[in-house]
Amino acid sequence: CHCVDCRKKIGGIISIIQLRENAVDIDKSKLGTYEHSGGSGNKIKKFFCKKCAAPILTYVSKWDKFYLYAGMLDDVSILKSAYNIFYEDSHFPFMEISERELKT
């Protein structure tokens, strides 16, 4: 994700994984949360570790989807495809991805 919100919250572009409903069992009651409006004005809910504040999940109300931060995975080889989202509007000017490499 290249969006301004992710860059400001994480400090750079991030890898996120869209979760299918019931794909993983995460006890959200053990996580801290905060809500804010994203760049589009839609509500975004962030879930983080209460001990170290590491980001765990993001919920985007507009799409009714949960996203897991890929950095949480021990084995990233299970990931099959990658897409760059919000690239056109928000990417770093020094980071150019060719049309062939860009999947949106």
Task: Label each region the model flagged.
Residues 2-104:
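A short Gly-Trp-Pro
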